[in-house]
Amino acid sequence: AVLAQAMKAAGARGAKLLVLHTAAARVGAMDVGAVTEGGLAAAIEGAEVIYNLGADEVDIAAGPLVIYQGSHGDRGAHRADIILPAAAWTEENGLFVNTEGRPQLALRAGFAPGEAKENWAILRALSAELGATLPWDTLAGLRKAIVTAHPHLGRIDAVAENVWQPLEVRAPAKADFIRAVRDFYLTNPIARASQVMAELSAMAASRAAKPLAAE
């Protein structure tokens, strides 16, 4: 209901509406169809084996076998039965899509430590071991396949115009708004592994807890 009201207001003023998502890469995932109706909970419900691609903000109950592919020893790694160490996003080249749908080219800032591999290389090697070899064996080949399937991802720094699909306007429910993000400093495994971010989080919590005295 709130989104429908916002879309109605934007349309009446000839403005554009930008949705700020709460998870990195969500827009890119929607672009390539890597989404599940009902979210993560629905995706893993009843699963016997879960291949976790660095999803550390989801609770996985006991039962299924969990294979974790990620860069940091965060929540997902602690729940995993098998861990495949991968490069962090700063340690590999890639395409990113920002919240407005703009494809961006990213170059790695450094190499992954130890035996960690680039994410695409892990998936390609695993596909060969499973007898379902993916039809590319280089990053360039993968990128070509992505752009062939989704041409707009090849238009770097360009925003595709989407067809406006207004929602049915309903009266919002009588409920309080809640904060989607509780701690902006610790929203992902890389941030949670950072001493600097931990210090900033503690400082923010301290400021919020202290009452302000009138001058």
How should each PLM-predicted stretch be described?
Residues 143-215:
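Long, low-complexity segments enriched in small/aliphatic residues
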Residues 1-156, 210-215:
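Non-catalytic alpha/beta scaffold blocks inside enzyme catalytic domains
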